[in-house]
Amino acid sequence: MSKTFPTVGIIADGLMAGMFISPGKSLGIELLCFDSKDAGHSDIQKCEVVTIAAQSNSLIIAKKLEAAGVTVRPTFSAMSAASEAINSAVDKATQICVMVARSPHGQATTWAPTQVISSNKKWTMSISPAPQLTSALQEKAQKLAMDFSAQIGAVGVIAVEMSVKEEDVSVVNVHIHPHDSGNWTIDGSVTNQYEQHLRAILDLPLGDPSMTATYVVTGNFHCGDKPNMYRPYLHLMARTPALKFHQYKNSGAPGELMGHITLAGNDLPKVIEEIEHALQYLQGEIDE
């Protein structure tokens, strides 16, 4: 790899690619972003390393790039192994996600396990650390995720989804790239998942994954009845000054994902209450 600042190729859908821009600039890294449809673009050959965070055709893309001599992280082999870990037979149990970062030389870190809450088959809220887990279960889940990432030879950030029932923890799905479940790290961790992913694929020392508060709650908001998605800022910013907004788009179809909000604090019931209020207000379910 060149001793000058490297060029990194990001193959991802628009929203995901945009998440890498700020940490990339902070590290002085040149990013070239490509849609999954542009994976054959000649500029990819200019990149010292390419990472794939596309939701579709990622295995096909990785295989073609590696055959062309491009350094891809994570590799086709790791991505293929991760895809085999999916277990669709999940009973009613606590759903958590553990984010892991791993570099080529084997340094690995993990963030606090996150409880994932869904409604109508949509991911709506995450709570970190997962409040229903004992410290022993948290450590068990983190170790399971770390061991899995090493087993498949993952490089970069991966999201390991798990089912927890009593003392049993099992892997049910794996996303071998940064994931929505880790968006709480943008405002709630010393090093967020997107910066950590860049560090990992470039084989740089990994950052501190510690939380910045006792609890961090993140909520996804979808397009509702608000004709103006900007006006809710007036009420919500005045009510909860510590609330962090990440608006992906200004308009959309009903039910479409519009962005996420995050709040950190030490009083979990209060933090959840504020996030729930903000989600309802943003989605037009309440007016005050």
Each model region followed by its residue ranges:
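Redox-cofactor binding/interface segments in oxidoreductases and associated redox assembly factors
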Residues: 51-52, 87, 220
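ATP-binding N-terminal substructure of ATP-dependent carboxylate-amine bond-forming enzymes
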Residues: 1-80
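A short beta-strand motif that forms the metal-chelation/ATP-contact edge
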Residues: 168-178
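Internal nucleotide-binding/catalytic subdomain
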Residues: 84-160, 164-166
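Active-site "cap" helix and flanking loop/linker of ATP-utilizing ligase/carboxylase catalytic domains
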Residues: 140-160, 176-224
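Peripheral (often C-terminal) accessory segments that flank ATP-dependent C-N-forming ligase machineries
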Residues: 4, 29, 41, 200-288
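Generic secondary-structure signature for well-ordered alpha-helical cores
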Residues: 59, 70-71, 103-106, 118, ...
